[in-house]
Every structure is written in structure tokens, then in C-alpha cells.
């Protein structure tokens, strides 16, 4: 089991997951426009292209990664975002660690929780990015895409909990998440503080198995 360090580190994987989160949530936003969705697809494809050349050309891969993050953050600044990004912001604000560390953990669970209200959009994103190339029903395609996101966190060896977080921090993190989420266009499902706790509490180390 991997954990976040006690001070800020540059995680290429966390940077990747941050951009992936922003692009995914922008795509499935209820008011997302065609050009926004096209940008989200391009961002995810660019992220994967960067990782594909990382060993042979690390400098170019890093430049592509940073460009993808910049483009993803532009979508966020326009109001296209979601709860995973809002949770990532709250964790970053409290502990000064990369948003991507929290987003990598919560994004799959949030996407699953949306169920039928988002599976068509998730499936469309999966197909357009080439993540799921075969012709499957939306529900199956969406599940494969979400599983792929989980595999990215594992491949990057990113933490599955936030070491710095304590139970007493959760109310503040929920409040900050709700405040950040107000800036975004409607997500597929509206969540209140009680709903969000089910996604934020699992970030605690105490809620994880101690078996590595």
C-alpha cells in the first residue's frame, strides 16, 4: 500500500490524474458543449501519448503532460468541473499536496455512483478516446472506462489514501468541497454534505486495510 508523503512532491502520475479528472468531469458535465467535449477528448489522448513516449523522450513527454494540464485547467476555469475536482482542491488546500492524489482515488467511485445518469456520456468518452474500442453497450463500456482509470492510479503507484488526513478534518473538507463545487456547471447527480462524506471518508488511512 502506497501513501502520500509528508511534503509536496512532483508526481508525474498525480499530474496525469489531475488532468484526466478535469477532462473527464468536463466531458460529462450536463451543460458541456461539443467543443468542450472535443477538448476533453484531445486532452486525454494527449496524456496517453505523453505516457507512451515517456521512456524514449522524457522531455517531450513532460512538455505534453504540462500542456494537457494547462488545457484541462482552462476547461475548469470556464466552469466545467465536478465533485472529484472539488475534493481534490479541498485536499490540496488543507495539506498542500497535488490535487491529483485525491482525485485519483475518488473519481472512479464518483463516476460509478452516477449510474445510468452518466453512463452514456462516460461510454462516449471511452470510445472517442480509444480507451474502449470494442462495440459494447454503454453500461459495460462505462464500467471498463472506470476500471481503466483505477488501473492508471495503480500503474503510477499513487496512494490509495491521504496520509495527512484525520477524521476531525472531514467536516472542513466537505464544506470546502461544496464551496468549490458551486463554481461548476451541474454534475450528473447533485450531492449534499452527507452524500459527499461517503466519498471523502475513504481517503482516511484508518479506513484502509493495513495489509500491503
Regions found by a protein language model. Give the residues of each.
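Active-site pocket-lining segment
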Residues: 97-160
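C-terminal charged capping/lid subdomain of soluble metabolic enzymes
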Residues: 132-212
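Carboxylate- and glycine-rich phosphate/diphosphate-binding segment that chelates Mg2+/Mn2+
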Residues: 1-79
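Short helix-capping/linker segments at secondary-structure and domain boundaries
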Residues: 27-32, 113-120, 209-211
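Alpha-helical scaffold segments in soluble metabolic enzymes
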Residues: 18-26, 42-53, 63, 70, ...
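Glycine-rich phosphate/pyrophosphate-binding beta-alpha loops
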Residues: 72-98, 183-184
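Catalytic cores of large soluble enzymes that bind and process phosphate-bearing ligands
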Residues: 8, 12, 32-35, 39, ...
